[in-house]
Amino acid sequence: MAGFFSLDGGGGGGGGGGNNQEDHRSNTNPPPPVSEAWLWYRNPNVNANANTNVNANAPSSSNAALGTLELWQNHNQQEIMFQHQQHQQRLDLYSSAAGLGVGPSNHNQFDISGETSTAGAGRAAAMMMIRSGGSGGGSGGVSCQDCGNQAKKDCSHMRCRTCCKSRGFECSTHVRSTWVPAAKRRERQQQLATVQPQTQLPRGESVPKRHRENLPATSSSLVCTRIPSHSGLEVGNFPAEVSSSAVFRCVRVSSVEDGEEEFAYQTAVSIGGHIFKGILYDLGPGSSGGGGYNVVAAGESSSGGGGAQQLNLITAGSVTVATASSSTPNLGGIGSSSAAAATYIDPAALYPTPINTFMAGTQFFPNPRS
């Protein structure tokens, strides 16, 4: 054990020095005062074969000499105890570093006896101090002894995983490693992204807009009118040709350009449960002889055929309409076509003047019911 041994001829030895029977030669000169007394301090943690006989006349510079014995000056009791505690902490640090294998693999460099040079021992002690201070201070990780890389935190051999496995040390810390290369991590993340659907949107990204439904264009002659999908105007619900009875009403219409009034006929028919309204305009004398009128239906293509159609048109009163074979039926009078030309009746005499007139190209509005 470590202890203090007085050099002034006294017997006192501190710190457990009484248990060690040490023989030393003291100086024959008169002892110095108590305040200037010198003490030997024995280091038990170094080479036991070191020489313990030291000349008492050694100069005071031997304070810093490294060996089995160190020279201490007895200033006061408190300073001695403080220096003793610091030295003991230093020794504990050296011993723990040597036990863990910190520093060079050659343990002979830790022998700080008189045979080893002072510079080499200082470098070894400095290396132990640096490595032990780095591991205990918490400022950084412990370096591996072999390669110098960062060692595993819980590794008792103070080595990294590669060096610990290459040397064959039985270290439980390096049995299983959780480290995964960056390339494998990226590959696994890409696989997970493709397999698992994205459940939530990242922060800052807006909700994606719903795609606009492109409705198929339907063939219809109705302008500015949206036909619902269940209206019944789909292909196949209406026949290509229709023969039905209708009542035509004579009205007066005028053009926007010249303002001259003319006669026209308006009607409404029901085809397939739907109402079709139109106006028949006067286009001049027909080419099939007689004085009949050549009329066309304004919405003839709305019946779905778009081609020639047969319309059975019946007028009010005694005026009858013959069935036509083309899209421009001929309006006749009573009897044959020649008789109809002779007994032509003015439509104004049959129908009163309407309250409102209709212009070409305008929408038809029926008269209000009384």
Curated annotation (Swiss-Prot):
Is Metal-binding found in the keyword set?
yes
In this chain, Zn(2+) 1 is annotated as bound at C144, C147, C155, C160
- List localization entries: Nucleus
Instruction: Report keywords, A-Z.
Output: Activator, Auxin biosynthesis, Auxin signaling pathway, Developmental protein, DNA-binding, Metal-binding, Nucleus, Zinc
Query: According to the record, what induces this protein's expression?
Result: Regulated by ESR1 and ESR2.
Q: Which InterPro entries match?
A: SHI (IPR007818), SHI_C (IPR006511), Znf_LRP1 (IPR006510)
**Position of sequence motif Required for homo- and heterodimerization:** 271-274
One GO MF term on file is: DNA binding
Point to the regions of Gly residues compositional bias: 8-19
Q: Where is this region: Disordered?
A: 1-37
Q: What happens when the gene is disrupted?
A: Gynoecia with aberrant style morphology. The double mutant sty1-1 and sty2-1 has a reduction in the amount of stylar and stigmatic tissues and decreased proliferation of stylar xylem, as well as shorter siliques and rosette and cauline leaves with a higher degree of serration. Hypersensitive to 1-N-naphthylphtalamic acid (NPA), but restored by exogenous application of auxin.
User: Domain of life, per the record?
Assistant: Eukaryota
Q: In which tissues is it expressed?
A: Expressed in flowers, seeds and seedlings.
The terms describing its cellular component in GO are:
nucleus
GO biological process terms, semicolon-separated: anther development; auxin biosynthetic process; auxin-activated signaling pathway; pollen development; positive regulation of DNA-templated transcription
Name the DNA-binding stretches. 144-171
**For Zn(2+) 2, which residues are the binding ones?**
C144, C160, C164, C171
Q: What does this protein do?
A: Transcription activator that binds DNA on 5'-ACTCTAC-3' and promotes auxin homeostasis-regulating gene expression (e.g. YUC genes), as well as genes affecting stamen development, cell expansion and timing of flowering. Synergistically with other SHI-related proteins, regulates gynoecium, stamen and leaf development in a dose-dependent manner, controlling apical-basal patterning. Promotes style and stigma formation, and influences vascular development during gynoecium development. May also have a role in the formation and/or maintenance of the shoot apical meristem (SAM).
Quaternary structure, per UniProt, is: Forms homodimers and heterodimers with LRP1.
Question: Which family does the similarity line name?
Answer: Belongs to the SHI protein family.
The name this protein goes by in its record? Protein SHI RELATED SEQUENCE 1
- Native organism is Arabidopsis thaliana (Mouse-ear cress)
Mind giving the lineage of the organism this protein is from?
Eukaryota, Viridiplantae, Streptophyta, Embryophyta, Tracheophyta
